[in-house]
A protein has these predicted regions:
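An alpha-helical, amphipathic repeat domain used for nucleic-acid recognition
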Residues: 1-55
Length: 55
């Protein structure tokens, strides 16, 4: 699945999977995690990302 991001307001990052909005995180979280280096993501990695965001 394609992972893409778009900048939001107030240091927010909007995360999209295959062009569909999935979630919003702040830029501190995004750039402190490994995900900002990814262009694609599988189901297991997506579940890991969602767990990280919700913890």
């Amino acid at each position: 699945m394609e992972l893409s991001v778009k900048p939001g307001r107030a240091q927010k990052i909007h995360i999209y999977i295959d062009g569909e909005y999935k979630m919003t995180v702040d830029s501190n979280f995004w750039y402190s995690e490994k995900w900002h280096n990814f262009n694609s993501i599988d189901e297991e990695e997506l579940a890991e990302l969602e767990r990280s965001v919700n913890s």
